[in-house]
Each structure stands twice: as structure tokens, then as C-alpha cells.
Amino acid sequence: YLVGKNSKERMSWDIAKQAIDYILDNEQSFQEKSVVWDFIGGEPFLEIELIEKICNYIKIELFKRNHHWFDSYRFSFSTNGLNYHEEKVQSFIKKNIDHLSIGITIDGTELKHDLNRIYKNTGNGSYKDVVRNIPLWLEQFPGDGTKVTISSPDLPYIKESVLHLYNLGIHEVNINCVFEDVWQEGDDSLFEEQLIQLADSIIDNGLYEKNDCSFFSEHLGKPLACKLQNQNWCGAGMMLAVDAAGN
């Protein structure tokens, strides 16, 4: 999704329908009170017509089957925000607004964002095309946060990027470090320096009253409860995932 290294695959309507039918046909195996239909793996709104067809089918089938998930479901999306303003996307949002969760990924300042999030055909950064859609997104989903990714080259921009996102009106900033081996000697010291400077700015300006940053979660550095130590994360072993081929 971020670095565009994977092969392109497109889920067909038939595969999507088979997956939905399997889940709804086996209601006894899925007794959770509610369900989140999460569209992941690429930029979802490139396939807005297929997604709308899928979501319409889900809603109709839940109603026809008198399924216990009827009116207890959510459609979840993580988008790069480039085509958030487009008519078909906005039409879908307005139809489903009460059952939607949408997060736009913006990495911070224009400099930091455009280090990684560029157009493949031109090499130009995408920041300006994303940031123009932030006010509309915040108007429609005021409580949703963004997801930031950091790696070695953009470590110097952590502080200014988080503060920039706060200034845009994004109050929840979740940050993940790249897990791959991209780090350089001395990155740990630079990382620490940026976090200290960011923390000082947040405290000195009282930004903690309305804003959150996952780097400063009160749970970090403390022992985990036994239940948390023995559970999987990111839905592993608990969430059912279906790929483009139906596997």
C-alpha cells in the first residue's frame, strides 16, 4: 500500500459475493454481536463501484435473512485520500455515513509526506492533493485519526509533522515505525531527540488536552496484563480475511 511493491490484483464481484454468502450462510459460526467489513490491501476507493456493489449486497442480504448483524455492522476503510472528494466516493459516503469508519493516511508536513508518498508516473509528491481533502474528511468523520509511518530518512521531521497534523485539526495521530531493516547508525539518538522535543512542545502548549499521539500512550513501558500478554494483535487468529483470489 505504501511502497507499492506488491503485484496488482483485483477482486472480482463473483469472489466477493461468494465470500459474503459463505459468511452469512454460516451465521452459527459467526456469533459476534457486530461485524466490521474492512476493505484493505490497496487503495480501496479506486474500486468504489465494486465496493458500493459489495456493500449494497451485504445490506440487502442482512435484511432479507433477518440476520443478527442487520443494523449492527460497519464498513471500514483506510485511504490515501487522493480521490476522497470525487462524486462517486462522496455519494457512497453519504449513503452509508452512519455505518462508516474512514481514516486518511497523511504523514505530516509536505516535506515528510512527499518523501514516500509520490505518484509513480511522475515522481511528484501527493501531499497537496491529500491535504485539500482533510477539511471535508474531518467534517464528515471528526473523531477519526490518521496513521503515520516513519523510517530512517524522515526521523528529523517527527516533531514538526505531529504538530502540523494537530494544526490541521487531526486530534489523534497514530504512528508506526517501518518494521523492515531500514535503520542507520545513530537513528536511535535522533529518534529520542525528536520525541523529547515533541513532548516538550505538547506539554508547554497544553496540546495534550485535546490531542493524542500513540508514541506517548500511557501503556508504553509498563507491564502488560496477563490477558494482553497472551493475545494476538492486528486481528491475527481472530479476523477472517479474504484475498483477491478468494483464499
Label the model's feature ranges.
Residues Y1-D14:
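Canonical Radical SAM [4Fe-4S] cluster-binding loop centered on the CxxxCxxC motif
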Residues Y1-V3, L138, L207, D243:
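Extended hydrophobic/Leu-rich segments
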Residues N6, L111-R117, W183-E185:
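A short acidic, helix-capping loop that chelates divalent metal ions and anchors anionic groups
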Residues W13-I40, E47-V178:
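Radical SAM/AdoMet-radical enzyme domain recognition
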Residues C177-E180, N247:
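Short acidic (Asp/Glu) and glycine-rich catalytic loops that position anionic groups and cofactors
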Residues Q184-N247:
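A C-terminal junction/extension of Radical SAM enzymes
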